[in-house]
Amino acid sequence: VYYNLGVSIPTDYATDDSEFDLPGFWYHKNLRSPREAPSFHTSKSWNFREDRLSSPLTGVYDSRSGSTLTVLRNEQMRAEALTTHQEGEIILGGATTIGYMGFDNENGRVSLTFGYPWVETPKRYIRKLTLVNPATTFACLEPGEKVTLSWYIRESKAKDYGHCVADTWSYCMDRINPQPINTLYSSEQMKA
């Protein structure tokens, strides 16, 4: 069986009162980005591969109430199946742990979106200032095979968007607990 699991958490936050956080990739409504890059200029709803983000998280801050909602992927192992296609429906040829994170604003209210395996909509951002048609991937689940997926969902309060991002970053680092990577060569050896 080939599958793609998508989840949407609706909120009562109005799109016009909301600011978004996809760490390292999208802040506020991304309106400072050129029209050729993902932003509210192109669409009010976006989904991205979670490996494009510095942390696999989607979040929203409601400026009217000070409420925040975040979804953080809980995944320790990393695997990726390379694809031969850049757009459309893609059946993955191997194992991947990469899902997606995003948000939906089509009805004027915010929903946070996430799932597995990855989806990029309404456009796929393949390189600087290049948007192409969307992509949806499908993973194979063999008879008797088991897949476990988990995300952390968190509600909190913040006095403004800056505090929301700072609090989310601390929460993310506490949950993910990144460790230094042991490299084969020192910086000096690499520069030599």
Predicted ranges, named:
Residues V1-A192:
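Carbohydrate-recognition beta-sandwich/jelly-roll modules
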